[in-house]
Amino acid sequence: PAWLGEMDRSVIDVKEYEDLYHQILREHESVFAAQDQTQIEAALAEIAAAVRIFVIGAGREGIAARSFAMRLMHLGKEVHWLWDDTTPGMTTGDLLIAINGSGCIGHIDYLLDQAGKTGARRLVITGAPAERTPSEAEVSLFVPAMVYKGTDPRTIPSKQPMGNLFEQHLF
């Protein structure tokens, strides 16, 4: 087929591929090295203490958040994706984990506010800790990886587009 010839011209050579994946690995090493271990410990303590966990995110960060929710369920936690129709209401003892790379997504701010009114605790995982959303939470985990529309100068730059580094680092 004609499209096969087009595909052959766009194939990345092996050396270029190796250079790219080594660069991506170095980016992740830099993010891990820059993370505040006390924030990680605080986030883990919130997760361990929660009776039930609710997870929210939007766009590609939301896809990563759903994967994170599934992994928490595999660890034995009762976990709900906040957008599901069958999600129960939150109450004291519950935890809402909001993934918000840019730190300023209005509907996530609204949901954090509502969760706080129920007595649930709130954890925000973000690449922009000085923005509005992280300030709404009891605990904030700064992932210093480049995010889409991020402004924090401490984030690790990436050769990858948009917020790929942040989204990958969520795993």
For each of these PLM feature ranges, what is it?
Residues 32-49:
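A short, well-structured juxtamembrane/interface segment
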Residues 54-58, 64-169:
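Glycine-rich phosphate-binding loops that contact phosphosugars or nucleotide phosphates
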Residues 16, 39-42, 60, 170:
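Short, contiguous, pocket-lining structural segments
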Residues 21-23, 45-50, 89-92, 109-110:
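A short alpha-helix capping/helix-coil boundary motif
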Residues 3-5, 17-21, 43-46, 86-88, ...:
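Short amphipathic alpha-helical segments, especially helix-boundary/capping motifs
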Residues 1-7, 164-171:
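Extended alpha-helical regions
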Residues 3-33:
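Generic N-terminal amphipathic, Lys/Arg-enriched alpha-helix
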